[in-house]
Amino acid sequence: MTRLVLIDGNSLLHRAYHALPKTLTTSEGQVVNAVYGFTRMLLKVIKDLKPQYLAVAFDMKGPTFRHLEYEKYKEKRPEMDTELAAQLPVVKELLESFEIPVYEIQGFEGEDVIAALIAQSAKRKVQSQVQSSKLGGLETVVVTGDRDVLQLVDERTKVYAPLKGLSNPIMYDAAEVQKRYGLTPEQIVDYKALRGDPSDNIPGVPGVGEKTAVELLQKYGTLEEVFNHLDELPERQQKLLREYRKQAELSQKLATITTNAPVELDLDKCRVGDFRSKKAIEALKKLEFKSLVRELEGGEGLRSERPKQEEQEDAGQLELLEI
């Protein structure tokens, strides 16, 4: 099946920034640890997943529609480090040199943009580069470290997520989601409605922990059915769920990734090309990513070896990025 890979740019860049030391700089002192880690992971994704189409989605600065629903949404999340923020435009310039399209829309998170692109891709018929037959829709793989996106998993959509830093990625289909979390992809939203999500300041139901939320959904299936069977629950759970029902319903709304972001999937622009273009090589040279330049200029594809000098500079951290 023809494959479209959609990368959650903010998630990957954030992970790269925290996985690699800030001592990874250019000769002029420009910190490029996040850019380097992002680029390494990008090339690993291309090597491992072999997509025919590829795009990257980013958040945009400013409030989203979720902030309009709940002013305290993500209230406790600290501002992006200035050294990370400075690398965001650098990554976008690098993606442009690779001719990889970037999608971002004010008022929506990157996850919403990805969901909208997935919804559109499901309706497309594309010519397979491997087969001559027409295929209805695309297989889509979302690359992200954010487990919220697991709610998008279905028969045509998978999530490729690193377990630690940027290493040991797992390919989530519906069976893998069930195996690891005891829930179906469709239940992820209702789980967050009950449990909440401290990282996004989604309140959930106070007193309902991870174990209880999973048990309730395993027994009743959905948040609505949990409320339909309150009389069957222990008195304490009944009291909490009755008292915080509106808060749970708000949390459900906040946790739901929407598919209505106003973006348009352009498969022609997303088609994966040759990254050994002069423009791409020059962009890597400017950032002084010598090993990547050697790999691409040598025409040997995405090699697993890396220069010893760079390995030493990375202070033992780049084993997370070996490809």
Segments predicted by a language model, with ranges:
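Noncatalytic, basic helical substrate-engagement surface that gates or grips nucleic-acid strands
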Residues: 1-124, 136-140, 149-173, 246-250, ...
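Glycine-rich, charged/polar anion/phosphate-binding loops
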Residues: 41-42, 145, 238-240
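Non-catalytic nucleic-acid-binding/docking modules located in mid-to-C-terminal regions
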Residues: 50-52, 156, 169-323
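Ser/Thr-centric signal marking residues that sit
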Residues: 64, 144, 212
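Intrinsically disordered, low-complexity terminal tails and inter-domain linkers enriched
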Residues: 122-138, 299-312
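Conserved RecA-like ASCE P-loop NTPase motor core of nucleic-acid helicases/translocases
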Residues: 140-146, 288
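A generic "binding-loop/recognition-motif" signal
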Residues: 145-148, 198
